[in-house]
Curated annotation (Swiss-Prot):
One of its GO terms (biological process) is intracellular protein transport. The gene is ARL4C. PROSITE patterns: ARF. Coiled coil: none annotated. Small GTP-binding protein which cycles between an inactive GDP-bound and an active GTP-bound form, and the rate of cycling is regulated by guanine nucleotide exchange factors (GEF) and GTPase-activating proteins (GAP). GTP-binding protein that does not act as an allosteric activator of the cholera toxin catalytic subunit. May be involved in transport between a perinuclear compartment and the plasma membrane, apparently linked to the ABCA1-mediated cholesterol secretion pathway. Recruits CYTH1, CYTH2, CYTH3 and CYTH4 to the plasma membrane in the GDP-bound form. The keyword Repeat does not apply. Expressed in several tumor cell lines (at protein level). Expressed in lung, brain, leukocytes and placenta. GTP binds at residues 20-27, 68-72, 127-130. Belongs to the small GTPase superfamily. Arf family. It is found in: Cell projection, Filopodium; Cell membrane; Cytoplasm. This is ADP-ribosylation factor-like protein 4C. One of its GO terms (cellular component) is mitochondrion.
Length: 192
């Protein structure tokens, strides 16, 4: 991918919103990325926000401003405000909670249909892959009907275990790559 600093200015921070149903593991992902260790969390009432300079992978050194928005039903109407004008969306899914995948799908499709979010790169983190009975990535992709998202939405499904950090670096690298491609595409459209 070349020199990262030529792709994103050192002074620029990517705006990333983390969404998903309650108990999917969003806050665990956030603090694993920030501290590179497990931090015991409590349900998010409202949101958490952190500026994090990524420390691993292709996106190493890139500064990101993360917004981790609570996933309880009463907080979901706020998702639209927090996801407006974002560089990327991370949608965390509990790979074991099969009973709530339909609900996760409905909420994800709502978010990606907001006019402001059309075409925004999407990283789906299939969390809790370390647990027995976790669904494989292909099944999660199918259950979430990702193929039905608008064609402009690029996405990647990343198997992960937020508690130990497995898969998070790879997922962030993929999200960063999708953000760069989108920016390049938007820049080319402006030139026309």
């Amino acid at each position: 991918m070349g020199n990262i600093s030529s792709n994103i200015s050192a002074f620029q921070s990517l705006h990333i919103v983390m969404l998903g149903l309650d108990s999917a593991g969003k806050t665990t992902v956030l603090y694993r990325l920030k501290f590179n260790e497990f931090v015991n969390t409590v349900p998010t009432i409202g949101f958490n926000t952190e500026k994090i300079k990524l420390s691993n992978g292709t996106a190493k050194g890139i500064s990101c401003h993360f917004w981790d928005v609570g996933g309880q039903e009463k907080l979901r109407p706020l998702w639209k405000s927090y996801s407006r004008c974002t560089d990327g969306i991370i949608y965390v899914v509990d790979s074991v909670d099969v009973d709530r995948l339909e609900e996760a799908k409905t909420e994800l499709h709502k978010v990606t249909k907001f006019a402001e979010n059309q075409g925004t790169p999407l990283l789906v983190i299939a969390n809790k892959q370390d647990l027995p009975k976790s669904l494989p990535v292909a099944e999660i992709e199918k259950q979430l009907a990702l193929h039905e998202l608008i064609p402009a939405t690029t996405y990647h499904v990343q198997p992960a275990c937020a508690i130990i950090g497995e898969g998070l670096t790879e997922g962030m690298d993929k999200l960063y790559e999708m953000i760069l491609k989108r920016r390049k595409s938007l820049k080319q459209k402006k030139k026309r």
